[in-house]
Amino acid sequence: MTAQMTSEIFSHADSLPTDEERVVYLRQNHTKAVRELLIHNFNTNIKFLLPEGRPDLRTDEFEPQNSYFPNLGATDDGATLNYEVRKMYLFIEGGHPNLTALKRETLWHELVNSLHPSEADDLWYMKDKKLQEKYKKITHLVAHNSFPEGVQQPEAKPKRDTSGRFTKPEKPKKKKAKK
């Protein structure tokens, strides 16, 4: 049996009604690609050395799925993200310091063009750390609860008062000693 694509797993998890169900589903159906996409997307210490956004490519230049495997049938997916995710170190800070920016971008385009369009789309979102924009219900907290060993716990956002200013967290008041 072939592994599910990341887009199938994320779409199904996104359609579940509660965060607890999403966490259980992601744990039961995780693949290396799902785990790595969530870790790279939500880990603030990982910085991609690629330009932000998608390049303006002509459609004849951008042919995801089967670009490396022209003889595969219509049911075959070509390269899968589960296999290709091992190359992520090439695109992050500190991963391969001797790689030039041009070579890094060339390798990125080759990687994206070798994947199924939905997996390539997930990769683009992950690179810009915007996977939660595509899958609205897969939040940082869901990712952390699914893979606590890889995804940092989300930091609490500061609260604002009615005028828009940040409020300080209330500290417990110290009791004065009676004399």
Labelled PLM ranges:
Residues M1-K179:
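N-terminal nucleic-acid-engaging modules of covalent nucleotidyltransferase systems
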